[in-house]
Amino acid sequence: YDVVFASFSLGTPDLRGAIEKMNEACSGTVAVFHFAGLPYWEQIMLDLWPDLHGVPYLPGPKAEIIFNLLYRMGIYPDVSVSSYEHRLTVPDLDAGVDALRGRLLVETPEQEGILRRYLAARLIPGGDGLVLGHRVHRACLRWEPHRPGGGLRAV
């Protein structure tokens, strides 16, 4: 393939294997898009998981893990980072609780109360309801895996 890419999909136990497969399949450019910081839902999980479930939340790998693995593999990608303000908009507090209940595995009234208090302290009026804003950073790592004469080089 001329271009092989993965978009926010490398939360795999065998990251090296996934990268090797992309390199093998690509005759042009490999591009990996991944978070360079916490997305809003992971920030909420990091904040609430201990209170909800009694254990810390362990976020998945981010772009720096992918970069470091590529570096150890002898791949030196071009890296670009962009950011935007993610806005979770809900009509009211109840809808906010409902929107996050499943992701946070909220099952009991006590857990719902924890989530409700968290959102009540953070949702702000805006637009068509209540808004939870969060700055999201994304990275693009690009490289050319195959070159005549051997070796790997960034694009």
Ranges and model annotations:
Residues 11-12, 36-40, 85-86:
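Short, catalytically relevant binding-site loops at active-site mouths
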Residues 73-155:
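Conserved Class I S-adenosyl-L-methionine
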Residues 26-40:
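Conserved beta-strand signature within the Rossmann-like core of class I S-adenosyl-L-methionine
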Residues 36-56:
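Short, glycine-/aromatic-enriched active-site segment of Class I SAM-dependent methyltransferases
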Residues 51-63, 104-106:
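Acceptor-substrate binding/catalytic loop of class I
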Residues 57-80:
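Short alpha-helix
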Residues 4-5:
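A conserved beta-strand element that flanks and buttresses the S-adenosyl-L-methionine
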Residues 10-27:
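A short, conserved alpha-helix within the catalytic core of class I
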